A protein has these predicted regions:
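Signature of N-terminal electron-transfer/Fe-S-associated modules in redox systems
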Residues: 1-151
Length: 151
């Protein structure tokens, strides 16, 4: 049985090691902030951090995740005080909100790796995260705001 550390807690997952991490996070561990969007890694709704890197949990198997540190939107900040979350609020990014967890996780990984991202780096990093409401301009502004606050 795969053992995976999610948000600082060790979990023994009684499931097929080929199960997508997304379903273990949502259905077994009970953390529903990570969303299912497409199931093929194209939309970004299921983005989590694995050892600090943004990954698509719908494509990452339990076997792939074993031995790695997984952080979901719930683990990014217990009280919503991560700079990206605060910037999201300050820039009025959310509309329907479905993509927000994945967008925030992708943006947080970007800022951790590239504390002062250029406009093109933001566009490139966020290109795999789809927002059906079209708030891309506000998303980019929020990332710039968060980067300023962090740096």
């Amino acid at each position: 049985m795969p053992q995976i550390k999610i948000n600082g807690v060790e979990h023994t997952i009684d499931a097929d090691p080929q199960m997508p991490l997304l379903w273990a996070i949502r259905d077994i561990v009970g953390l529903t902030g990570t969303k299912f969007g497409c199931g093929v890694g194209a939309c970004g709704a299921c983005t989590v951090h694995m050892d600090g890197q943004a990954v698509r949990s719908c494509l990452t198997t339990l076997a792939d995740a074993q031995g790695h540190v997984i952080v979901t939107i719930e683990g990014l900040s217990a009280d919503g005080s991560h700079p990206v979350q605060l910037a999201w609020q300050a820039n009025n990014v959310p509309q329907c909100g479905y993509c927000q967890a994945g967008q925030i996780m992708q943006a947080a990984a970007l800022i951790k790796q590239t504390p002062k991202p250029s406009d093109q780096q933001i566009v490139d990093a966020m290109s795999g995260n789809i927002c059906r409401c079209g708030t891309y301009q506000r998303i980019r502004q929020a990332i710039k705001s968060a980067a300023e606050w962090v740096g």
